[in-house]
Amino acid sequence: MEFSPRAAELTNLLESRITNFYTNFQVDEIGRVVSVGDGIARVYGLNEIQAGEMVEFASGVKGIALNLENENVGIVVFGSDTAIKEGDLVKRTGSIVDVPAGKAMLGRVVDALGVPIDGRGALSDHERRRVEVKAPGIIERKSVHEPMQTGLKAVDSLVPIGRGQRELIIGDRQTGKTAIAIDTILNQKQLNSKATSESETLYCVYVAVGQKRSTVAQLVQILSEANALEYSILVAATASDPAPLQFLAPYSGCAMGEYFRDNGMHALIIYDDLSKQAVAYRQMSLLLRRPPGREAFPGDVFYLHSRLLERAAKRSDQTGAGSLTALPVIETQAGDVSAYIPTNVISITDGQICLETELFYRGIRPAINVGLSVSRVGSAAQLKAMKQVCGSPKLELAQYREVAAFAQFGSDLDAATQALLNRGARLTEVPKQPQYAPLPIEKQILVIYAAVNGFCDRMPLDKISQYERTIPNSVKPELLQSLKGGLTNEKKMELDSFLKECALNY
């Protein structure tokens, strides 16, 4: 049978139509809720989903896929699960959890997903960063060598912190853990105002996990009154927020801090506190039917904190020389630092500042136990002058504590022991400091130099704080400023004559 011209025409027409055929359909992989309760949804049908991927429920609530099983997917819900019903549709978003980052975040208060909660409108120009990323490798890092000043005499002299370090703040409730963190943020105000370049400025990220909303509001007020909010970001997952948001908040804050670290700038991040994050993670894991381990925590609770804290680093010069310093906070029960979570975090960090209730009630504030507190890498970052004056106090304080216990029993002590007790009592008095009153480093050096070199030895203990306040204001400003560069013999002679003269008034 011959092909007629009409048939050939029709064939060409059909071919052209088929080749130009285009479907503009968007194919979404969807699943259905099998069961829901306690903030956990079991979903059937999401066969291609990735671990840690965001999903969206029909009600608009979002969730994250944590358990990928044969039959279904275990999804933790970010928000209330009351609007989710059995049989509801669940849609994949195709994206791993990410948060906004950048300088537009400074001065803002956001939740664990980076959504502003301060009532000041949407965020302006920003980029998005994944919440979970790998920590920088060995080649990309450099050893810690720049100081991160807290403005607290007890910390900057005895347990110094460097940029890129992880220093744990550990203690019972109501011992002043948050106060140390806030003082550190406030101290950056005077340092940032003198900074001449981006590489000198230190930006701060404060992550509040499981705290009262009133506490977070109070913190915002303190920072804004001190004009410290302009270089700070607050990430809040309060006690009333669901456990998944309390688990996610530290990672979100870390991603925001990493923006500065990876762009050649410096950032400080405070996790307040990681005990509550571990409790939130335990709750999620048990509801997801993961096997419990010690203290009912899941087996990977160490990895929960290690992968977070390893992201704090000092980058090498080739990768921008930025840094992210971490100050995680852990709350202990009745001073037990050998519990599961405290020992985990102590082993991950580069040192710890131990706070004690007994010292706090004795009026030694910040209530730092100098014997238990260490900084494993910070001394390399300490200023030369501070290193020169702080060699002996730690040893003298240790000897004082040893002798003070025996001195309670006997009254007839030899002159050397009496002198040691006398000096120790004054060295215990010097690190005391009121809250929200950080001290510039040059004033700290002056005060510690006076105490270490015996200028306070004959002074009544109740006069020492007054003496401390007076000497930085009486000394020549140029001599005070020159202390940062180190102590030469000429400077020491000049300081000695000035301090001797001042001590006569007390």
UniProtKB/Swiss-Prot annotation:
Keyword Chloroplast attached: no
SUPFAM superfamilies xrefs: C-terminal domain of alpha and beta subunits of F1 ATP synthase (SSF47917), N-terminal domain of alpha and beta subunits of F1 ATP synthase (SSF50615), P-loop containing nucleoside triphosphate hydrolases (SSF52540)
Any one GO molecular function term: ATP binding
Site entry: Required for activity: 373
Localization: Mitochondrion; Mitochondrion inner membrane
Keyword annotations: ATP synthesis, ATP-binding, CF(1), Hydrogen ion transport, Ion transport, Membrane, Mitochondrion, Mitochondrion inner membrane, Nucleotide-binding, Transport
Subunit architecture: F-type ATPases have 2 components, CF(1) - the catalytic core - and CF(0) - the membrane proton channel. CF(1) has five subunits: alpha(3), beta(3), gamma(1), delta(1), epsilon(1). CF(0) has three main subunits: a, b and c.
PANTHER family named among the record's database cross-references: ATP SYNTHASE SUBUNIT ALPHA, MITOCHONDRIAL
UniProt name for this protein: ATP synthase subunit alpha, mitochondrial
The species this protein was found in: Beta vulgaris
